[in-house]
């Protein structure tokens, strides 16, 4: 028979009492009243904060956006098909944040920073809030370094600087994405990290962009954030902020970044959908009252940081789609007023075969020549003036039949300059090549050629200079000035190439 010893029992009881943890864990919970269309109404969640993440019983995450007296309106970050009425919801005490690290370079991710390219998990130990405050006035400095796009029309007349926000605006199918992707391709070797955010696009279009980046070797310095047209509105709304958080991570590490939002019209539509389903009062074009703040808080995060913060930069190229050229609609006017200039793409120019279809007359960069190297300033001033005069004369020449010789010459020069601005897609030009192209056109060296021969001649001239006179490129890249020596080399090369070209044409 086992003897029961009282002191042993009392020791065990004493130990258990000492181990007893009196911590009380308070969980803020609620119950699903209604769910559907990506929105859930929750009863309870008394302590929930605006923008806080909430977790449903079956694992779906949502964001508490509407805090009303009787219930909480939550937008779902998923389809929410398994959420049932009456199931429980708990507040997480966190607001939306994503992991960030160098390992994201070369990957395709979604708005929650989860990889969607089938290449496994991304290791990361650091987190950043999706919504971070923009740098203040003291944290910034004015934009002064150029960010070359590789497109002559932009780099010469609508220059973009590091830390600038330049809107790309135009109708559908006018080449907006092409301008943005060419800019990314041109950052090769420039030590610029690129983030391309695709919002509400066809999956096939995003796949095409990613393939282009891979073929041209641009993926190694690029992150693609994609939420396609079949994604929930919540994720389409969050995607740009995810991209901005990733770009900021590099910016605060003294790196230069370029971010493209393609496009903000789709983000505004997703936000409108969420707001209307949450029964927020609609305003102009049925957008909610805070749609301006939606874009301003996103675009204000682009900055050129002060020397104290390491002089990193984040350049933003938001894209906005217009309906039949109407820039006075709500979203276009909002984004125009937030950004530091706009590149306007015209359907008429596109259909006339002028590509990139940039309407130089109404496009503008509010940073201006501060974002150009001296060599480009030296040759580009004349180009803008001559093109403006040509546009005026061309309209006038449609009505006048007998034009004097000077006007005819100016029209002929203008046609050749317009030809010089045409570029193939995915073929950005280095700044040295742009300078020689513009110089050749503005100084009349193309006047003797037929309009149809201009592009062929320029391609051959660029190749000739690269192989036979590499010192031209060396002078421009080292001094950033179009020196007399560089001009002499260029004149000589143009002369030699013209003679060769004329002989070739005669032989043909």
UniProtKB/Swiss-Prot annotation:
Subunit structure: F-type ATPases have 2 components, CF(1) - the catalytic core - and CF(0) - the membrane proton channel. CF(1) has five subunits: alpha(3), beta(3), gamma(1), delta(1), epsilon(1). CF(0) has four main subunits: a, b, b' and c.
Gene3D superfamilies: 2.40.30.20, ATP synthase alpha/beta chain, C-terminal domain, P-loop containing nucleotide triphosphate hydrolases
Keyword Coiled coil: no
Disulfide bridges in this chain: none
GO molecular function: ATP binding; proton-transporting ATP synthase activity, rotational mechanism
Name the UniProt record assigns to this protein: ATP synthase subunit alpha, chloroplastic
Site description Required for activity, residues in chain: 363
Source organism per UniProt: Helianthus annuus (Common sunflower)
């Amino acid at each position: 028979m086992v003897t029961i010893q009282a002191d042993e029992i009392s020791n065990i009881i004493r130990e258990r009492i000492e181990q007893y943890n009196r911590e009380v864990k308070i969980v803020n919970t609620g119950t699903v009243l209604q769910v559907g269309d990506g929105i859930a109404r929750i009863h309870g969640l008394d302590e929930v904060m605006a923008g806080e993440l909430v977790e449903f019983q079956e694992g779906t995450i949502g964001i508490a956006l509407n805090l009303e007296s009787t219930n909480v309106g939550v937008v779902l970050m998923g389809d929410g098909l398994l959420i049932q009425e009456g199931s429980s919801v708990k507040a997480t005490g966190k607001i939306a944040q994503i992991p960030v690290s160098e390992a994201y370079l070369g990957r395709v991710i979604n708005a929650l920073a989860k990889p969607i390219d089938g290449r496994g998990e991304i290791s990361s130990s650091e987190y950043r809030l999706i919504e971070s405050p923009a740098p203040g006035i003291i944290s910034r400095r004015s934009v002064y370094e150029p960010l070359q796009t590789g497109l002559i029309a932009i780099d010469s007349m609508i220059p973009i600087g590091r830390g600038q926000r330049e809107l790309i605006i135009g109708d559908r199918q006018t080449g907006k994405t092409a301008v943005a992707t060419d800019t990314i391709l041109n950052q090769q070797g420039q030590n610029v990290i690129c983030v391309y955010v695709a919002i509400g696009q066809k999956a096939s279009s995003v796949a095409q962009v990613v393939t282009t980046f891979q073929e041209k070797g641009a993926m190694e310095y690029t992150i693609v954030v994609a939420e396609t047209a079949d994604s929930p509105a919540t994720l389409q709304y969050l995607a740009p902020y995810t991209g901005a958080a990733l770009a900021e991570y590099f910016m605060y590490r003294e790196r230069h970044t370029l971010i493209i939002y393609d496009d903000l019209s789709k983000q505004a539509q997703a936000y409108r959908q969420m707001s209307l389903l949450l029964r927020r009062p609609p305003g102009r074009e049925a957008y909610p009252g805070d749609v301006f703040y939606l874009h301003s808080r996103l675009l204000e995060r682009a900055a050129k940081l002060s020397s104290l913060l390491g002089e990193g930069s984040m350049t933003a190229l938001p894209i906005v789609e217009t309906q039949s050229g109407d820039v006075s609609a709500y979203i276009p006017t909002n984004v125009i007023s937030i950004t530091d200039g706009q590149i306007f793409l015209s359907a008429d120019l596109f259909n006339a075969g002028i590509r990139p279809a940039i309407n130089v007359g109404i496009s503008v960069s509010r940073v201006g020549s501060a974002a150009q190297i001296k060599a480009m300033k030296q040759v580009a001033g004349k180009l803008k003036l001559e093109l403006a005069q040509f546009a005026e004369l061309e309209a006038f020449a449609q009505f006048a039949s007998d034009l004097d010789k000077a006007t005819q010459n100016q029209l002929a020069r203008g046609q050749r300059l317009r030809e010089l601005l045409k570029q193939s897609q995915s073929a950005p030009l280095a700044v040295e090549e742009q300078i020689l192209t513009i110089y050749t056109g503005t100084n009349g060296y193309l006047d003797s050629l037929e309009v149809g021969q201009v592009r062929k001649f320029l391609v051959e001239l660029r190749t000739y200079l690269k192989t036979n006179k590499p010192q031209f490129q060396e002078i421009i890249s080292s001094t950033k000035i179009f020196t007399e020596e560089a001009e002499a080399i260029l004149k000589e090369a143009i002369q030699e190439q013209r003679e060769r070209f004329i002989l070739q044409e005669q032989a043909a």
